[in-house]
Amino acid sequence: MTEAKEIIKFAGLEVHFNLFNTDTHDQVCLFKVVVHPGARMGVPHYHEHFDETIYGLKGNTTYTVDGKTIELAAGDPLFIRRSTPHGFANVGAEISEFLCVITPAVFGPEYFREIAPVLNQPGPPDVPKLKEILLKYGLVPVMA
């Protein structure tokens, strides 16, 4: 795989961008996610305007999609249709990695650049700020 154009790190996750939305006239965005042991998606959510296709590269990532648990291993594909609540975690002791393809790419690195500082702050995250950022980019939080 070619070297990432940008890497954004936050809360035990690394997002390695290989193809920006701006590279494809907002048709496709491609990035690799590295999930360190114990890390999880910051806020479970669903997307209003785009679908997400995942492909496992390394280790195991536990996804929850529409209330169902799915174990994603290397070589496993997963399609998450827009409006489907989902989240993920690495509950194992080893790093997991997966590719993520966003279509159409109405969502790109801007979201991660904005949310990373909020999730990297010491102490509990600012939930109203997280919600504001998610909604700005068409992600609807599913919080308890």
Which residues does each predicted region cover?
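Short acidic-glycine-tyrosine-enriched beta hairpin
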Residues: I8, G67-P85
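Structural motif
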Residues: E14, N60-T62, T69, P85, ...
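Ligand-binding loop in jelly-roll beta-barrel domains
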Residues: T24-D26, R82-P109
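Short, conserved beta-strand element in jelly-roll/cupin
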Residues: K32-H36, Y46-T64, V101-I102
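A short glycine-rich, His/Asp/Glu-containing loop-to-beta-strand
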Residues: I8-P44, F50-D51
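Acidic/histidine-enriched, glycine/proline-rich intrinsically disordered or flexible terminal extensions
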Residues: R113-A144
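Structural signal for conserved beta-strand scaffold positions within catalytic alpha/beta enzyme cores
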Residues: F17, C100, P141-M143
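Short beta-strand segments
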Residues: G42-P44, V65-I70
